[in-house]
Amino acid sequence: MRAMTLEDVDAVLAIEQAVQAYPWTRGNFIDALGHGYICRVEEDGGEIRGFAVLMPVLDEAELLNIGVAAGQQRKGLGRAMLREMLDVAHKMKMRRVFLEVRASNAAALALYRSSGFGKLGVRRDYYQNASGSEDAITMVCELKQEATLPHAGVWPGERANG
């Protein structure tokens, strides 16, 4: 992954609009870049395939957004990007990473659980949806600040022997 730039916003926005029912706006991405959030893109052959936005706050961070192009989903790209963002947070000495996800997003919930995130709570009626609203599940991943990086050994949620 590499740092997202203003020149990437159109491609990132296209992915966001294609995969999210209630997507971020161009302004949301520009604001994230302007506020110094950690914004990354994954590209292959000059084509952006995914993105992630992490907001650091003191010794914690919040994963604000992560998206994978529709044609690239279910190939491990989301997991790889999530791991890289956790690695970035770890290198910045963050103690934990928070996120929130729609209660109906079973694929994302499974990815986050298998990557070491645990349920923290529920925000009732947090997201808009076709029937009005739905809950957000808040999750946290505790990052251990040991001498080795998480990916050098075992990631949270993984067994030592795979």
Describe every region a protein language model picked out.
Residues 68, 102-103:
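Short amphipathic helical patch at the helix-1/turn junction of helix-turn-helix
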Residues 3-75, 79-92, 125, 142-162:
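Acetyl-CoA-dependent GNAT
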Residues 37, 134-138:
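Short hydrophobic/aromatic beta-strand or adjacent loop that forms the aromatic wall/cage
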Residues 98-100, 118-135:
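Conserved catalytic-core motifs of GNAT/GCN5-like acyltransferases
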Residues 112, 117, 139:
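Conserved active-site tyrosine of GNAT-family acetyltransferases
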Residues 82, 105-108, 125-130:
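Short glycine/proline-centered loop/turn elements that form peptide/ligand docking sites
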Residues 89-100, 111:
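Conserved GNAT acetyl-CoA-binding A-motif
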Residues 1, 101:
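Conserved SAM-binding loop
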